[in-house]
Curated annotation (Swiss-Prot):
Entry-linked InterPro entries: ATP8_mammal (IPR039017), ATP8_metazoa (IPR001421)
Residues annotated with N6-succinyllysine modification: 54
GO molecular function: proton transmembrane transporter activity
Subcellular location: Mitochondrion membrane
Chief place of localization: mitochondrion
The protein's name in its UniProt record: ATP synthase F(0) complex subunit 8
Keywords tagged on the record: Acetylation, ATP synthesis, CF(0), Hydrogen ion transport, Ion transport, Membrane, Mitochondrion, Transmembrane, Transmembrane helix, Transport
The family this protein is said to belong to: Belongs to the ATPase protein 8 family.
Modified residues (N6-acetyllysine): 54, 57
Quaternary structure, from the entry: Component of the ATP synthase complex composed at least of ATP5F1A/subunit alpha, ATP5F1B/subunit beta, ATP5MC1/subunit c (homooctomer), MT-ATP6/subunit a, MT-ATP8/subunit 8, ATP5ME/subunit e, ATP5MF/subunit f, ATP5MG/subunit g, ATP5MK/subunit k, ATP5MJ/subunit j, ATP5F1C/subunit gamma, ATP5F1D/subunit delta, ATP5F1E/subunit epsilon, ATP5PF/subunit F6, ATP5PB/subunit b, ATP5PD/subunit d, ATP5PO/subunit OSCP.
Length: 67
């Protein structure tokens, strides 16, 4: 059974990594980034849940127990 020749693997893998790095860098250089990023002000909104606006049975006085 013949042996697998792995001699060109190193240069193939190395050239693939270098090519991917160059492609990635060229794609990232197309984007414009702000020089001094400013923090974004977030508006906090208050949401009223239905159980906060109406009375429920746990807030009512205890009812009389009928025996």
């Amino acid at each position: 059974m013949p042996q697998l020749d792995t001699t060109p693997w190193f240069i193939t893998i190395l050239s693939m990594i270098i090519t991917l790095f160059i492609l990635f860098q060229s794609n990232m250089s197309k984007y414009l980034y702000p020089l001094e990023p400013q923090p974004k002000t977030l508006k906090t909104q208050l949401y009223n849940a239905p159980w906060e606006t109406k009375w429920t049975k746990i807030y009512l006085p205890h009812s009389l127990h009928l025996h």
